[in-house]
Each structure stands twice: as C-alpha cells, then as structure tokens.
C-alpha cells in the first residue's frame, strides 16, 4: 500500500473526509467558550479546543469502528469502512487511536487541572460509547453525554469552574444530540435489526418522529435558558428562531422514514448548529 492509499484509508477511518461530525461537535464547544468568556475567548484556549475537537472526533471514529468491525460489513452504509473491509488491521487502528489520544491529552496539559480531570472522564466516555450499542436501546443518550463533554471542559478552561449556565448548554446539546443521532439511526434501522445493533430509532419505533420532536423542543428550551442566564439578546434570539426553522424542516424530511431523507435531516443539523453559533457570536459583537 503506497502513501496515497494509506492516507485514503486513514482519512476514511478517522472521517476526515466527512467533517459533519467534527462540525456538530465544534458548534456547541465554541458557544461554550464564548459564553464562558462573555465574548471572545482566550486565543490559546480557543486554538487548543478547536484542534482537540478534530482529534477527539477522529479518536471516536476509530474506537467506534473497532467495536463494530464484525458488524459493519452487514450494514449497507458501513460495509466499506476500513476495519470492516480489512483494509487496515485492528492493531494499526488501535495504535493510531493511542497516538491521537495522547496528542489530545498533551494539548489539555497546557490548561488547568480541572480541565485535565474532565478530559480523563471524556476519553473514558469516548471509549465506552461504541459498546453501549450492544447492551442498551439508548446508546444515543450516552452519545449525548460524550458529545456534550467539551462544554464543561470549555467553561473550566476559560473560567476555572463549571457554573449552572454551562449545564443548561450541556442539557441543550444532550437533547439535540439525541434528536439528530436518532435521525441518523433511522437510516440504518432495518440493517441494525438484522444484526442486533440497538438504537433509539428501534426503541422509539412508530413514535420516532414525535419523540425526536420532543427532544428538539427540550433542546430549544435549554438553549433559551442558557442564553437567558448569560443575558443574551435579540441576535441570539434570531439564531434560536433559525434553529427552530431547521428543526421543522428536519421533521418534514423524516416524515416518511426513508433512508436518504433521514440522512439529509441528520446533515441539516450542521446548519442548525451554525445558526446558533452565528447568532450568539453576533449578539456579542454587535
């Protein structure tokens, strides 16, 4: 395997070629940094968190594919993944995971002790998540914790503490993650039922759209509470309204529960997150 082929395998293993996950992690992290700083966060902290999000998303993808390597070949969307197709060995994948994980931890060591402690919890949660799909019908709820963990870390890095305001944002992102990852799980539901992978899309069954809607409403309420506790104004409110518009559009997309529209609804959440981030940023700047 030449260098170009190796890069292709690594980029697919870490999903560098598919940045949607990185972006969905990044928007709430950047919002947390802004809220904690009351505007523009410390540049050093900002750079560390952006790089850290990219690295930890890659780590999450590797450990997810390692856990699912014997099942991915039976699922239409995942059968071409490098571990499932045999393009890369499990040993090589785990070595890459360790290298990236240590790199991320090295960045965290540049910050305060509370952030370091929270980061240890974060990496443990990242490792545990893929295996929850074997034991519970609610892995998306565990993923919501994993994907929201950068929020208390961001507050800790910027202020040295994690105030109540941070937990409103944490709750908002948790609800939002459960909603959009259930849309994602709807894409694979038929295959997951065959191979025994558990998900909220299966758990919710015929009430999937309604329960996703409830999580979207809960996320909306908590995003509003987070903004309220930080005394945010009109422009953040416009971001919230745009988020509502995108959420409504997503409900329309998943109405018939077809694979392609459900996947499109999942991807659309990037724009919902961007709207919140831009609204918050504009509210501080203008």
Curated annotation (Swiss-Prot):
GO cellular component, one term: plasma membrane
Cofactor(s) it depends on: Mg(2+)
UniProtKB keywords: Cell inner membrane, Cell membrane, Magnesium, Membrane, Transferase, Transmembrane, Transmembrane helix, Ubiquinone biosynthesis
Disulfide bond positions: none
GO biological process, one term: ubiquinone biosynthetic process
Catalytic activity as recorded in UniProt: all-trans-octaprenyl diphosphate + 4-hydroxybenzoate = 4-hydroxy-3-(all-trans-octaprenyl)benzoate + diphosphate
InterPro entries in alphabetical order: HB_polyprenyltransferase-like (IPR006370), Prenyltransferase (IPR039653), UbiA_prenyltransferase (IPR000537), UbiA_prenylTrfase_CS (IPR030470), UbiA_sf (IPR044878)
Bilayer-spanning residue ranges: 21-40, 95-115, 142-162, 167-187, 210-230, 235-255, 266-286
Enzyme Commission number, as recorded: 2.5.1.39
Function of the molecule: Catalyzes the prenylation of para-hydroxybenzoate (PHB) with an all-trans polyprenyl group. Mediates the second step in the final reaction sequence of ubiquinone-8 (UQ-8) biosynthesis, which is the condensation of the polyisoprenoid side chain with PHB, generating the first membrane-bound Q intermediate 3-octaprenyl-4-hydroxybenzoate.
NCBIfam families the UniProt entry points to: ubiA_proteo
Family, per entry: Belongs to the UbiA prenyltransferase family.
The protein's name: 4-hydroxybenzoate octaprenyltransferase
Upper classification of the organism: Bacteria, Pseudomonadati, Pseudomonadota, Gammaproteobacteria, Alteromonadales
Gene: ubiA
